[in-house]
UniProtKB/Swiss-Prot annotation:
Protein's organism: Erwinia tasmaniensis (strain DSM 17950 / CFBP 7177 / CIP 109463 / NCPPB 4357 / Et1/99)
Sequence segments annotated as region (Disordered): 1-26
GO MF, one example: structural constituent of ribosome
Disulphide connectivity of cysteines: none
Keyword Ribonucleoprotein: yes
Domain of life: Bacteria
Keywords: Ribonucleoprotein, Ribosomal protein
Pfam families per the UniProt record, alphabetical: Ribosomal_L32p
GO CC, alphabetical: large ribosomal subunit
Similarity section: Belongs to the bacterial ribosomal protein bL32 family.
Stated name of the protein: Large ribosomal subunit protein bL32
Length: 56
């Protein structure tokens, strides 16, 4: 089994963890239906940028 030779420093640990942070999802509110959705995605109703794009 691999065993480290030297203890990694706080700096190296921090550099490794620098990409581990989570980002919040960018949400938008549709101007017609008022529904919350992900940016650049359609709403559950089928609206995108105030227009009905999926008709059921």
């Amino acid at each position: 089994m691999a065993v480290q030779q030297n203890k990694p420093t706080r700096s190296k640990r921090g550099m490794r963890r620098s990409h581990d942070s989570l980002t919040t999802a960018a949400l938008s509110v549709d101007k017609v239906s008022g529904e919350t959705h992900l940016r650049h995605h359609i709403t559950a109703d089928g609206y995108y940028r105030g227009r009905k794009v999926i008709v059921k």
